[in-house]
Amino acid sequence: MNQAIRSVEYDRPQGTACSIGQAWAKVPDSPSTHERLALKERIRGLLKREKAVLVAHYYVDAELQELADETGGCVADSLEMARFGRDHDAQTLVVAGVRFMGETAKILSPNKRILMPDLDATCSLDLGCPVDEFSAFCDAHPDRIVVVYANTSAAVKARADWMVTSSIGLEIVADLHARGEKIIWAPDRHLGGYIQKKTGADMLLWQGSCLVHDEFKGVELDLLRAEYPDAKVLVHPESPESVVAQADVVGSTTQLIDAAKNSSATHFIVATDLGILHKMRIAAPGKTFIEAPTAGNSATCKSCAHCPWMAMNGLRNLAEVLERGHNEIFVDAAIGERARLPIDRMLDFAARHKKRVQASGDLAHDTALFSNVGAA
């Protein structure tokens, strides 16, 4: 690495803390077994009536993931959700996730109707990167290429030169660095720092963070590893450096699931949103998954390893949005057209450069492969 990380401090917007509280207040109660079965049957009928397909993120509750799989929908990372929706015949997509995912789906499928169970379901990375402040920051550094993570608003994407996911962010930054480009990175400081450390690129880092991953604690993880010495540690790169440093595998949602499936290990400590455990248990039955610690035993946490905005998606509001057709995502046509450019640039790069990674099942051997791939 030829240069230390350079960063610019920005406070989170005033509404963020309130938004967290409001999100937890809006998390729906779990329905009874009888109501759950009735809601699922109702939703199946409404999906058929509306000729709609359900796309869900790995971080939403298990019952929504199950329903998406059972009805021919998709459970995936954020970019694959949008790709699936773009390529599916359905003209109505119901996105169970957070708002930037709905916006990305609309950008890639501008002529389709995009619905969400709750339009208030947002993301701390999105909230922490308001377009006016970010645009001013970019204007102050006109000599830099602007690279933004998928977890941003359509307006922020429209200000960017490149959009990336963790599947290809490292490769794109490495390519830009090799061409002598200097970079503005937004919004996640931990993922940006990880990529900067790997590539040595000249990067100015926006100081955003994921509410969930930012709370994982390196000291507490070290203590947990002592309790489970044979467990392999799976870490999403949005986590702090002290957590990433202890990982056996650093990767995205999809890649962490694959690592759990393909490894010969039987115990895993998982440092990402606990919603992913549903798919991990399906992919690797009989294996044990332990949540990485977000705080000490007597401490409180804002997320406790589960995104409050993801938790706002439930069976009741899913049925309601299909019944009423409200909560539709709209993206200004000009913004959507401009935001698609950095997305297409990433997809074109992936088509030219991406190679399939074959895993051996040996974590010690595969760690180098997993550390550079996967989507958010």
Curated annotation (Swiss-Prot):
It comes from the Bacteria. GO terms for cellular component: cytosol. Pathway: Cofactor biosynthesis; NAD(+) biosynthesis; quinolinate from iminoaspartate: step 1/1. Binds 1 [4Fe-4S] cluster per subunit. One of its GO terms (molecular function) is metal ion binding. The keyword 4Fe-4S applies. Its main location: cytoplasm. [4Fe-4S] cluster binds at residues 123, 210, 307. Its cofactor is [4Fe-4S] cluster. GO terms for biological process: 'de novo' NAD biosynthetic process from L-aspartate. Its EC number is 2.5.1.72. InterPro entries: NadA, NadA_sf, Quinolinate_synth_A_type1. Keywords: 4Fe-4S, Cytoplasm, Iron, Iron-sulfur, Metal-binding, Pyridine nucleotide biosynthesis, Transferase. It catalyses: iminosuccinate + dihydroxyacetone phosphate = quinolinate + phosphate + 2 H2O + H(+). The keyword Iron applies. This is Quinolinate synthase. The gene is nadA.
